Amino acid sequence: VHWTAEEKQLITGLWGKVNVADCGAEALARLLIVYPWTQRFFASFGNLSSPTAIIGNPMVRAHGKKVLTSFGEAVKNLDNIKNTFAQLSELHCDKLHVDPENFRLLGDILIIVLAAHFGKDFSPDCQAAWQKLVRAVAHALARKYH
């Protein structure tokens, strides 16, 4: 993926303002609520029976933070996203058997969460840069499947 200086600035500038715990928890909770079939990968998380249960679930919060923290690795390694996610791709493919389409869904949800949290700061240019990033991360995570 080729990044312009402006794209890098838009991504890193916004990332510096992201509350990883809150945005991560919200993104994962939204994924599980909006796309309920993704819940099957989180059976060990306990009660996922309703939106309220999902939002209040401490394991969802913790894993959401973990997921968004790994996204931070992409932000730090924009020029090497494939290698950055090689091990996670292997884990999600070989051990967890996650449908790679779910990575794209989570990326789309993250865009919605960022837009909700940052409003006007999440300009169309910023959204375009972040959309490119979530696509690159989803592609890197799906790499082991190809």
Curated annotation (Swiss-Prot):
The keyword Nucleus does not apply. Keywords: Heme, Iron, Metal-binding, Oxygen transport, Transport. GO terms for biological process: hydrogen peroxide catabolic process. Residues 2-146 form the Globin domain. Heme b binds at residues 63, 92. GO terms for molecular function: haptoglobin binding; heme binding; metal ion binding; organic acid binding; oxygen binding; oxygen carrier activity; peroxidase activity. Red blood cells. One of its GO terms (cellular component) is blood microparticle. The keyword Iron applies. PROSITE patterns: GLOBIN. Heterotetramer of two alpha chains and two beta chains. Belongs to the globin family. Involved in oxygen transport from the lung to the various peripheral tissues. This is Hemoglobin subunit beta. It comes from Aegypius monachus.
